[in-house]
């Protein structure tokens, strides 16, 4: 028996600086697999669609704005149905697992994976893995069909349960092999996708005909490459309720301060977009933008000035902001089961610090602290996220049926793509505070940047020079393997 091909990333180079960061395929290590006509050819719902099947050479650029003399840059394989599939309908035994924290849209993704497998490809055997990764070997499975998932998109949470941690690669793959599962749909954040990548590598090592597909989920919107993560729009919309309440409280009291803490462990996207959407916020604090409390240009001085000028203000704080002010080192901070640092409650600490400052200076102030952290992630997804979840799920199913594996289904520049796991797990998506979007926020709130010239210059130095233009930093990983096409 021949050994599997190299596990290095699949890179295809083309003219004009074209780079395709391709995803693995079952035939990479099982070259003799038969193909079958796609059942969608006989599906009346798609008979009127012209060019419904995606061309094998279609790809989507990672960056759409380029210099006229610059390279074409990195591309990803376009998602969608192929004319040939590598699984027969009766052969498919699929499973779905959700891991990590809750996020609006989880049930919608589950529903659409089941519906796509059932209605598009005639698949009958679909299982839900109960309670995250450990459910593969520690719990019973949940049979899923179109009747079971019919209206679950109207509910928050996940009907198959979730958990953090519990990743035991050998036990998980043993369970997949023993149950005869050949399509695995894994819904979760960056840690979950890293686990999915390890599962895929073990499945490839065992040379199993099993497609492993990731669907990226994080309410913080901190997964790289993709335009946004599902549930983010809903979270921003739901955060408006808390901000509106804070604004009402602040306006109704002398020197009133409405203080809202939102999710955002390392990335401040929810706080930033909720602030921009609200237009009632006077100060937004995020992990990426350091700030200080005392002295000229500090937060306390800004609060005093804003209260003097307007008589009230609203502060929005991401949960990961200001952690350095609470403790000198994060090294001793405990971890949760997924390996994430358990952050201290900076919201309570900062609100108390503001109260103490005003009391010390004998100034009247009324602060109302609102923490909707878990409320914004436990709600059903809104209309926009429901549509997005549908597209993600359908694209994931099309890719698995076409034999692709070891990839994440994601939206890049408005197009559905297949992204190799290593691009999703290699870094984290953060707000770039020298970017136009952060400048728009500062213009909206009229808050200081809390950065000196030195901080700004250092931030800009961190951004790599590249002929590709974008609002944020661009990072094209080096080509590690060349495949001539």
UniProtKB/Swiss-Prot annotation:
UniProt KW keywords: Allosteric enzyme, ATP-binding, Cytoplasm, Glycolysis, Kinase, Magnesium, Metal-binding, Nucleotide-binding, Transferase
User: SUPFAM superfamilies in the record, alphabetically?
Assistant: Phosphofructokinase (SSF53784)
Q: In which tissues is it expressed?
A: Expressed in roots, leaves, stems and flowers.
Its job: Catalyzes the phosphorylation of D-fructose 6-phosphate to fructose 1,6-bisphosphate by ATP, the first committing step of glycolysis.
- GO terms for biological process, alphabetical: fructose 6-phosphate metabolic process; glycolytic process
Q: What is the lineage of its organism?
A: Eukaryota, Viridiplantae, Streptophyta, Embryophyta, Tracheophyta
* Activity regulation remarks: Allosterically activated by AMP.
User: By what name is this protein known?
Assistant: ATP-dependent 6-phosphofructokinase 7
Gene name on record?
PFK7
* Binding-site list for Mg(2+): 190
